[in-house]
Amino acid sequence: MDIIENPDKYSKRFSAWRGDERLSGYPWVENVHAPLAPLKRALPMLNLGLISIAGAYIDGTEPFDLESRDGDSGFHEIPVEVEAADLRYAAKGYDPKAVQQDRNAQIPVDRLLQYEANAVIGKLNEVWWSVSSWTPNARL
């Protein structure tokens, strides 16, 4: 199943979009089918990977590009041992204040580690991935 069901139609609408930050007239992807599948096992039997769109990156590394019209399709791989104080946020489209005060507001690493310790989930992956909060071109 394709993530974007009609990519050519979407690309045409995206090309006509002005690119204003308020997303006025943004050409949202319109799908009939959802590209998700139900779980086939109980959570304690599963390993969990975390992907966040908070735009997080480790202090001292390259932030996401928020100036590109298409957005930034890159990602940062962040070990779960990295402390919240060592994270920065390249944010566009949301105010990062809440996540700066408590990363679990958008990146629930600490809660998921507690779930792992209490056997609610099987195992949390050793790294998690952060992608940009600014990726208006869904075809990237």
Question: For each predicted feature, which ranges?
Answer:
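Metallocofactor- and cofactor-centric catalytic cores in central/energy metabolism, strongly enriched
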Residues: 1-140
